[in-house]
Amino acid sequence: MSEHHFVFVHGAGHGGWCWYKLANSLRDNGHKATCIDLKGAGINPTDPNTVSSLDDYDEPLYAFLSQLPNDQKVILVSHSVGGGSMTAAMCLFPSKVSLAVYVAAAMVKPGTLIPERLKNVMKICSGLIEEETEKIWDFTFGNGPQNLPTSIMMKPEYVRDKFYNESPMEDYTLATTLLRPAPVMAFIGIMDIPGAPETDKIPRVYVKTGKDHLFEPVLQEVMLALWPPAHTFLLPDSDHSAFFSQPQELYQFLLQAASSLSP
C-alpha cells in the first residue's frame, strides 16, 4: 500500500480537532495526516475578529504547503466553507497538491462570478437570508456597529440540528466546548478567489452528505453542476459533519479516492 499524506482543512468555527477520527484511522494504517488550524481557529491564538482577509485566514495552510519539499505532494481534504480555503491554496500551490477532496464543502471554480442561483441557495441553506440571520447566528462587530461584523458564530440552540444532527452525542458535546467565532472577512474572500489555470489540472472529488441540514443536498447539487469533479461519493446518512457521523465510511472514501492517483 502506498503511503499518502492527507492535509485536513476545517470549516467555520471548527479547528483541526474535528478531524481526529480520520487522522487516527489514517495514521493507524500507515498514512500521514496533518490537521491545520486556520488563523483564529482551533488552538491558533489569533483573535478571529482581527482576521482581515481570506489569505490572512489561510496563512497557516499556506505556510505548511510552502515548506513542503518540491518532490512531495499532499491530498487536501476540506469541510464546509473550508472548501474556499482549500481552493485558494490550490491556486497558490498547484504543484504541491495531488488531489482535492471536498466533504460537504464550498466548491466554486476560482476566477468565475458566482451565479445568483448559487448565491441564493447558499444563503437559504446556511440561514443567511435576511429574515433568518439573527435567528441562527450571533455576530460580533469588532469595528463598531456601523461596519460589517468581524465574526460570526452559530447560536448554541441550532448547533445540534445544523452541524451534528446525525452525530454521536459525545462528539456533539465535545464540539460545543471547542467551537469558536469565525472571521467574516475570510468568508467574503471566498466569493472572489482569482483564477489559476493550473488548478483545473488537480483532480477533485466531492463527498455528498445526504442528511445535511446546513449545506443541504440541493446546494451540493448546484455546486456539482457548476464545477463538476472527477468523482462523487455519497454518504446517505451523514449530517454536515461526516467526520463525526460517518467517519469509517468517509475514511474508506478517502482511501478509494487516493487509490485513483498514479503511483
Curated annotation (Swiss-Prot):
InterPro entries, alphabetized: AB_hydrolase_1 (IPR000073), AB_hydrolase_fold (IPR029058), MES/HNL (IPR045889)
GO molecular function annotations of the record: hydrolase activity, acting on ester bonds; methyl indole-3-acetate esterase activity
Origin superkingdom: Eukaryota
Catalytic activity: methyl (indol-3-yl)acetate + H2O = (indol-3-yl)acetate + methanol + H(+)
EC number(s) recorded for this UniProt protein: 3.1.1.-
Keywords: Hydrolase
Pathway membership, UniProt: Plant hormone biosynthesis
Record function comment: Methylesterase shown to have methyl indole-3-acetic acid (MeIAA) esterase activity in vitro.
Family: Belongs to the AB hydrolase superfamily. Methylesterase family.
Protein name per its UniProtKB record: Methylesterase 18
Species this chain originates from: Arabidopsis thaliana
Gene responsible for this protein: MES18
